[in-house]
Design a protein with these regions (language model features):
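Hydrophobic alpha-helical transmembrane segments
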Residues: 17-22, 48, 55-56, 77-81, ...
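Hydrophobic core segments of alpha-helical transmembrane domains in multi-pass membrane transport
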Residues: 19-32, 62, 135-139, 178-188, ...
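Helix-loop-helix "hairpin" substructures at the membrane interface of multi-pass membrane proteins
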Residues: 96, 100-101, 110-115, 119, ...
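Transmembrane helix-bundle core of multi-pass membrane transporters
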Residues: 126-192, 219-222, 241-250, 301
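Transmembrane alpha-helical segments in multi-pass inner-membrane proteins
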Residues: 231, 241-307
Length: 325
């Protein structure tokens, strides 16, 4: 094992990431062997990618928040709120699709600003404010849409159907390219810029950063703003893949996004984050969901399995930190 760790390729890519990719491949093979025709390769890959498109943006966003030592349980309902309100504006007020997409991102930005302000400047615990935002997002979406589901245009729509090309164009996974490009940008921000380094330092030792003269409130708030923007983008890709959105939903994606993030190597106590690991973790969670559905398990069983994954990932993280210390 020590020789493997010293391998230049392994050191460059990271042993944990390589193991995650191996787990992803083995999981896919296992599902195919066990399920057979119930798990068709082409359809399974397409369904997994549709899940990755939106869940990936949620996981990337919450990676920034967790890196500061915070948490955000509102990302799923906020994503639905973004999609519902912007879609309602398009269907009821004939707002152009491009403008509706901008509204999506702006709503996510507003929630990110609100959460960041309350955590950073009002000293409200992240858990409390994120739970409050979750209910606020559900309430606003229900009131605005009169508790009605909202459907975005189909690809056949001659005026607004073009936005679906962001997900897939003639079978080519455009959404995957966009997601990976955004992940690269997130990695550059987190590892190669001053704001990113401050965000990571906040999770490691917030008090030491404050005593060194850094405005910790500003940088903590920035992490939540980035998260909100990415959630807004995720809403666009959700409706691009699934069309219809219903008020009152979205909670189930909180744990899945956090599970992908933590499974990828981001520490729940902050200070350590892996964008590359998050990307792989999202693929694993998305593939797992497709496998669970192919087995015929219900939503309740899916939530139980996702919750157990979070527990195991956090336990592994805590154990690793104890060994280091």
């Amino acid at each position: 094992m020590e020789k493997l760790k010293q391998n230049p390729i392994v050191k460059k890519l990271g042993l944990n990431r390589i193991l995650l990719v191996c787990n992803l491949v083995l999981m896919f093979v296992d599902f195919k062997v066990v399920l057979g025709s119930k798990f068709p390769v082409g359809d399974s890959i397409k369904s997994t990618l549709n899940y990755v498109y939106f869940l990936g943006f949620l996981s990337l966003g919450v990676t920034f928040v967790i890196a500061t030592g915070g948490i955000d349980f509102s990302i799923g309902p906020v994503m639905f709120c973004c999609a519902l309100i912007s879609g309602y504006c398009m269907t009821s007020y004939h707002v152009p699709c491009a403008a509706a997409m901008v509204i999506c991102v702006l709503i996510g930005f507003a929630f990110g600003m609100f959460n960041g302000w309350m955590v950073s400047y009002m000293s409200v615990p992240p858990f409390i404010i994120s739970m409050a935002s979750m209910n606020i997002a559900k309430g606003i979406a229900s009131v605005f849409t009169k508790t009605q589901s909202v459907s975005w245009p189909l690809g056949s729509d001659p005026v607004n159907g073009w936005f679906r090309n962001l997900v897939s164009y003639k079978g080519f996974p455009v959404g995957l390219v966009i997601f990976l490009a955004v992940a690269v940008v997130c990695g550059i921000i987190l590892y190669n810029t001053k704001p990113g380094r401050y965000i990571l330092c906040l999770g490691s030792n917030s008090e030491a950063v404050r005593l060194s003269g850094v405005n910790t409130k500003k940088w903590r708030m920035l992490a939540y703003v980035i998260c909100g923007i990415l959630v807004g983008i995720g809403a666009i890709f959700f409706v691009g893949a699934y069309t219809t959105v219903q008020p009152g939903y979205g909670d189930q994606y909180n744990n899945e996004a956090i599970a992908g993030c933590v499974m990828g190597g981001t520490s729940m106590v902050g200070g350590l984050a892996s964008i590359g690991g998050t990307v792989i973790g999202v693929f694993i969670i998305s593939l797992l969901q497709q496998g669970i559905m192919a087995f015929g398990l219900g939503k309740g069983q899916q939530m139980i399995i996702t919750g157990l994954i979070v527990i195991v990932a956090v336990y592994v993280d805590v154990s690793a930190r104890r060994r280091k210390n």
